[in-house]
């Protein structure tokens, strides 16, 4: 099936047809680098990394641009608070961001421009808007005339008059209209600045993205992405700037990811439920966090909680255990004739790529795609002892292709599972090896019908919050 995406601009799913056949230009708004990144940043960046991977898996040549906003009021305020130059703050948190994204296994974008490296392009774009009558100078500032652009608010489906009537906006004598926004800000004493035709100053937030996206991708982009919180005002203002300057549509497909809630409440610093990526990764493996973020459809809200992270951990372990089983079986050299393979397993393996691809082509439905993967894992676990080597190799290859699109299961299965065991036992007084030894002793006791000793071992482990799970495949354990 063809790839279909939900376009925020039209409010509907549309077939994705690149402007230039075989090539895709994608711009995603990056972070303002003044502090550590939080779980909301993690979701947006993991989502668009997944989209980038899927587009490339379909044979498309993708130019992916993700910027850094490295000059902004928040950066200046943080620098003043810490008593350091603004660029010391921005460079520090660019490195922090890059480290967070590497841990979450993001592929590098094609370009990662910084706003401060594109001041000439920004100044030229502001001048174009002034020349065309869409912007005006007021003192050392330059503002955009929102009522001059006919398509203003077409992305957010708002009404300018209603917004003006309902808004509590302080009167700003510098502006012609209360909703006009800054393209260029005159420098205040002690602030960083650049020379411009309007005096010393720095760019506004919105103009940076218009200038950088068009420099690297041209006047019309295939995809522009970001969180839903950016629809207004940021993306709305980007459209106004870019289309007024070029006279052409700015973006063909607008994609926006949903919010992250914390224990069913909106995340906010004021509620005290604000978590940085670094804080989360102190308690959970980075791959588990990535898996969790992809477990829901990217446009849906997702609820961050310890329970949901633990469920994601168990889900990822199920996949890795199935892969570990395949590796062990293949390493054993045992073989079964292909003709003896279970028909359901043959069908699940043969049809997996199509089902997974169809789910991903339906507006990047990772939740459905993972459902198909768990169907395959279930059959792998059941048929592992008797399946032919060829079918197991095929199953392993199919899972690897899926994993490459989602950016998961990149570790050696045994190493990942050991990492999980070590993490789980870090807060208890027993190592994974000691637990496994007791499980082996319990199995021998039960085999010898010494059920009393078996129960003693079970109870001993339970006292240390370790729960044993018996199944036909053997005994596993988890921390309560």
Swiss-Prot record:
GO biological process, one term: cysteinyl-tRNA aminoacylation
Renumbered ranges of motif 'HIGH' region: 31-41
Primary localization class, coarse: cytoplasm
Enzyme Commission number, as recorded: 6.1.1.16
Annotated InterPro entries: Cys-tRNA-ligase, Cys-tRNA-synt_Ia_DALR, Cys-tRNA/MSH_ligase, CysS_C, Rossmann-like_a/b/a_fold, tRNA-synt_1_cat_dom, tRNAsynth_Ia_anticodon-bd
Recorded GO CC terms: cytosol
Catalytic reactions on record: tRNA(Cys) + L-cysteine + ATP = L-cysteinyl-tRNA(Cys) + AMP + diphosphate
Keywords annotated in UniProt: Aminoacyl-tRNA synthetase, ATP-binding, Cytoplasm, Ligase, Metal-binding, Nucleotide-binding, Protein biosynthesis, Zinc
EC top class named in words: ligase
RNA-binding is among the record's keywords: no
Localization: Cytoplasm
Residues engaged in binding Zn(2+): 29, 209, 234, 238
Motif residue range(s): 'KMSKS' region: 266-270
Cofactor(s) listed in the protein's UniProt record: Zn(2+)
Residues binding ATP, per UniProt: 269
UniProt subunit comment: Monomer.
Family of this protein: Belongs to the class-I aminoacyl-tRNA synthetase family.
NCBIfam families in the cross-refs: cysS
Name of the molecule in the record: Cysteine--tRNA ligase
Organism: Citrifermentans bemidjiense (strain ATCC BAA-1014 / DSM 16622 / JCM 12645 / Bem) (Geobacter bemidjiensis)
Gene label: cysS
